Structures are given as structure tokens and as C-alpha cells.
UniProtKB/Swiss-Prot annotation:
TM helices/strands, residue ranges: none
One of the record's GO cellular component terms: extracellular region
Protein name per UniProt: Conopeptide-Ac1
Additional note from the record: The mature peptide does not contain cysteine residue.
Organism: Conus achatinus
Main localization (coarse): secreted
Keywords annotated in UniProt: Cleavage on pair of basic residues, D-amino acid, Hydroxylation, Ion channel impairing toxin, Ionotropic glutamate receptor inhibitor, Neurotoxin, Postsynaptic neurotoxin, Secreted, Signal, Toxin
Residues carrying D-tryptophan: W64
Length: 66
């Protein structure tokens, strides 16, 4: 009986119901009306920002922990 309750109360809703936030992430860029050039620019911007963060992390010169 506990197995059936677990299946119907936990596993069944997790498998069938989809959250609203997950729906747009599953679509391709073309379906979101984003052309490949715009997608490439966004990706390039994020990669550049990430690289700069690791090369030059934010460390103020006059902070109390340095």
C-alpha cells in the first residue's frame, strides 16, 4: 500500500506535470525566434565574461580581508 501511495503522490506528478519555467528552456533557439547570429553573440558574451572573471577576479585593493 505504501508503494502505491508513493507512486501516485510523488512519482506520477513528477513524471507528468511540467513546470512553466522548464518549457521555454526545452525549445530550440529557432523556436524562440532567435537567429543563430544572435545566439552566437550571446554565447560569446557569456564566455568572454566568464574568462575575464577567472583571469581578473574582483579583489578590491583597500578591503578589510586583504
Amino acid at each position: 500500500l505504501g508503494v502505491l501511495v508513493t507512486i501516485f503522490l510523488v512519482l506520477f506528478p513528477m513524471a507528468t506535470l511540467q513546470l512553466d519555467g522548464d518549457q521555454t528552456a526545452d525549445r530550440h533557439a529557432g523556436e524562440r525566434d532567435q537567429d543563430p547570429l544572435e545566439q552566437y553573440r550571446n554565447l560569446k558574451h557569456v564566455l568572454r565574461r566568464t574568462r575575464n572573471y577567472y583571469l581578473y577576479p574582483a579583489r578590491p585593493e583597500n578591503s578589510w580581508w586583504t
